[in-house]
């Protein structure tokens, strides 16, 4: 959940003049709204974004982009060369989540798909469908205004952000050997802030994310004779409780860290003590030193609890997903910020402070040593925020409305779509000649 901390100018919780002018006509905008509804109704899981990639590739070709498909498995890249000038990368992610939608929208997803050996519901619960629609609209607008700028636009439609693997997959697949090297990477993420609001800050912005699998090994046996066993369930329970002390006792109050145990699985029957217990957990952090300290503490505690229980072998600890801290380049942000403010108005640009959400988009910039500028795009109906004029009042609203990853979450289409197009276009035009 995004918690606004600092308002660069007083936030306005009302509609106001939040739909910017655009070179796209009413028919093009309605077409993009249809694209959004279609993507929302047809979500696809990470690295399975085949239909979405097809929609993207067809749109880009129809608008004169050179298109490269299957980059990093299901990624799509569009290149629009328009004379001499800077190369600007604009990025959107495409994947959805294994969530059963409960929005009640007429275009709500009823999709189910295979995932890890089972069929699961699928939903665009994080707004990636809006990201795709906004970037497609930005591409169309940049084509329509190509006589007003020069340079090259690289539109990156990335798979598998939810696994924190898609950006690296595209880089490893030779993304930057196949397109012009960008001078800057720009992107946005929809959030439950009022539509017409942009959230951004220089420096560390989004937390790093690390997901781990820990297997604790015991010695199974009959539930009536626990003295003949080493019970991994009790071991896991002690491990979970001890993990709660990492943030409260080993991380300074001024630092940011979160340790969450998302699943604990052990056993098959009530009267059987199993041989092992598996835990899945996620760590969020901002400072690299804090990140290292928390990960080291998890390993130390797992081994110590196993030793205390008399486990027959050491635990197995696997890091299977990892995303770096998202850091906005201060100079690049200072250059881009006035453009964003020109779209929504300076009074609607807020500093939300460091947030514990994570993104793998930094890899697209750090892998080639170029700056990143990334912002939050408000997607909640501004009416919900009517009368909220202080940070505290905005926080109260954020806390009671659906947020990303909720089965109830969906951004309001307008003015979110129009503003998302304009923020991308206006930010890109700052860098293009």
Show the residue positions of the predicted features.
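Metal-dependent amide/peptide-bond hydrolase catalytic core
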Residues: 234-433
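Histidine/acidic-residue-rich, glycine-tolerant segments that coordinate divalent metal ions
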Residues: 77, 97-99, 106-123, 129-130, ...
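Acidic/His- and Gly-rich active-site-bordering loop/insert found
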Residues: 20-124, 129, 133-137, 141-150
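Divalent metal-coordination and catalytic microenvironments
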Residues: 39, 78, 90, 128, ...
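Short, flexible, mixed-charge acidic loops at enzyme active sites
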Residues: 100-112, 203-207, 336, 386-400
């Amino acid at each position: 959940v995004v918690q606004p901390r600092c308002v660069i100018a007083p936030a306005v919780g009302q509609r106001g003049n939040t739909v910017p002018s655009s070179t796209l006509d009413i028919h093009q905008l309605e077409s993009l709204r249809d694209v959004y509804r279609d993507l929302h109704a047809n979500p696809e899981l990470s690295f399975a974004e085949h239909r979405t990639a097809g929609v993207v590739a067809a749109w880009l070709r129809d608008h004169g982009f050179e298109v490269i498909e299957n980059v990093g498995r299901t990624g799509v890249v569009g290149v629009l060369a328009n004379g001499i000038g800077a190369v600007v990368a604009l990025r959107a992610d495409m994947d959805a989540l294994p969530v059963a939608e409960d929005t009640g929208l007429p275009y709500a997803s009823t999709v189910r798909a295979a995932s890890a050996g089972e069929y699961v519901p699928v939903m665009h619960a994080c707004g990636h469908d809006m990201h795709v629609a906004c970037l497609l609209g930005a591409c169309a607008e940049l084509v329509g205004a190509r006589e007003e700028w020069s340079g090259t636009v690289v539109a990156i439609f990335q798979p598998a952000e939810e696994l924190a693997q898609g950006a690296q997959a595209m880089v490893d697949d030779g993304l930057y050997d196949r397109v012009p090297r960008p001078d800057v990477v720009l992107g946005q993420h929809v959030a439950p802030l009022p539509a017409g609001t942009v959230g951004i800050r220089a420096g560390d912005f989004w937390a790093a994310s690390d997901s781990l699998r820990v297997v604790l090994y015991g010695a199974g046996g009959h539930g009536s004779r626990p003295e003949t066993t080493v019970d991994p369930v009790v071991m896991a329970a002690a491990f979970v409780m001890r993990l709660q002390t990492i943030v409260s006792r080993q991380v300074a109050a001024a630092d940011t860290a979160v340790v969450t145990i998302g699943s604990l699985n052990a056993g098959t029957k009530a009267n059987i003590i199993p041989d092992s217990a598996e835990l899945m957990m996620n760590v969020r952090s901002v400072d690299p030193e804090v990140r290292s300290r928390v990960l080291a503490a998890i390993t130390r505690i797992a081994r110590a609890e196993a030793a205390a229980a008399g486990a027959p072998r050491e635990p197995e600890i696997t890091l299977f997903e990892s995303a770096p801290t998202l850091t906005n380049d201060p100079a690049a942000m200072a250059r881009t910020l006035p453009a964003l403010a020109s779209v929504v108005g300076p009074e609607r640009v807020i500093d939300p402070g460091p947030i514990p959400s994570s993104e793998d988009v930094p890899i697209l910039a750090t892998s080639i040593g170029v700056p990143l500028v990334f912002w939050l795009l408000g997607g909640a109906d501004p009416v919900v925020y009517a009368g909220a004029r202080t940070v505290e009042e905005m926080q109260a609203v954020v806390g009671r409305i659906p947020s990303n990853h909720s089965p109830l979450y969906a951004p309001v289409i307008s003015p979110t779509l129009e503003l998302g197009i304009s923020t991308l276009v206006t930010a890109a035009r700052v860098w293009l000649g």
